[in-house]
Amino acid sequence: MKKLLASCAAMAMALTLTGCGSSGSGDREFEGQELHLYNWGEYMGENLIADFEEQTGAKVVVDYFDSNEQMYIKVANGEAYDVLVPSDYMIERLIQEDLLQPLDKSKLSNLDLLSEDVMGLEYDPENEYSIPYFWGTVGIVYDKNKVSEEDLQAEGYNIFLDTKYKGDIYLYDSERDSFMMALKALGYSMNTSDADEIQAAYEWLLDMNNTMNPTYVTDEVIDGMANGNKDIAIVYSGDATYVQSENEDMSYWMPKEGTNLWYDAMVVPKNAQNPLLAQEFINYTLTYEAALGNSEYVGYSSPNEEVMLELSGEEGMYGAYEAYIPRSGYEKDEVFQDNPILKKKIAELWIKVKASKG
């Protein structure tokens, strides 16, 4: 589950993954070439790299990052990769700073396999620079035996102010996710730059922090909820899918106030050393076989429409888990934008929120 478990995988050294069973023949188009991939940890199917190497004759060298910001620093400082897998708002920033090269759509024959829901988004409306890799939502995982669905329906994010759940909640140790929750609870855009709205969200978080005794976690939320240690938590959809698969008492709720609808996508940096091989890799990941292996292993929603429908069907691996299918078309859901003013302000305020907890 990328969004949290990546922090563990990123501690490892860069890995070189070489396919097994290659005949070593020289008739493959990219025989002997190298692809340098920079991705989140725990974010690829187990056979994705080996199968691509077998098919192309190339060798894939993978580095892992645990945040978009960590990735950005290396790319902005000139470190060369062929493929990156950043999130929506970071793609917007990379485009604005002219750090990406346009894709050659003639090399991407599998684009028609993708769901319309993942294409033509605001950060790259023509998909000139990015091709979707995974997508999902942020929502509430809760114990159906202990948390009332009526409370969730009536209160939405304000359930985190409901004192009957005091001491039984997990929250991400993340200013971005926490302020998203607070801003949405108050009816504001999570992309606001309005000082009064940001201040109101800060005060909401202070109130929650001082009355609800939340437990702030990172990857611990996954096993914690799977083990039933708390009753309610803010969780990314792929992690929620895992929690539900491990504990049948857990369910997933997307509040009526709206949430973060997020997208991670593949891009080619401007200084890529092998852009042709990069686009071959991107096109390969869109195939049914590659997309199926990715989504089965990671648990996040595939951009490949056939894969998503198969895995979410009655007989599918994730058919019983509502977290697997993102809510699309809901007007109050938003994609994070690159907003330096908001980012700087909430980082400062988050330190104060955490310091206020007794």
Annotated model-derived regions:
Residues 15-19:
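C-terminal motif of bacterial Sec signal peptides marking the signal peptidase cleavage site
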Residues 21-23:
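Bacterial signal peptide processing site
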Residues 26-97:
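Early extracytoplasmic/lumenal segment of secretory-pathway proteins
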Residues 38, 80-226:
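Extracytoplasmic ligand-binding site segments that recognize negatively charged/polar headgroups
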Residues 90-93, 226-227, 232-249:
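A ligand-binding cleft/hinge motif common to bilobed small-molecule-binding domains
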Residues 199-207, 246-270:
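Periplasmic-binding protein-like
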Residues 264, 269-330:
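Mature extracytoplasmic/periplasmic domains
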Residues 326-358:
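Conserved C-terminal helix/tail region of periplasmic/extracytoplasmic solute-binding proteins
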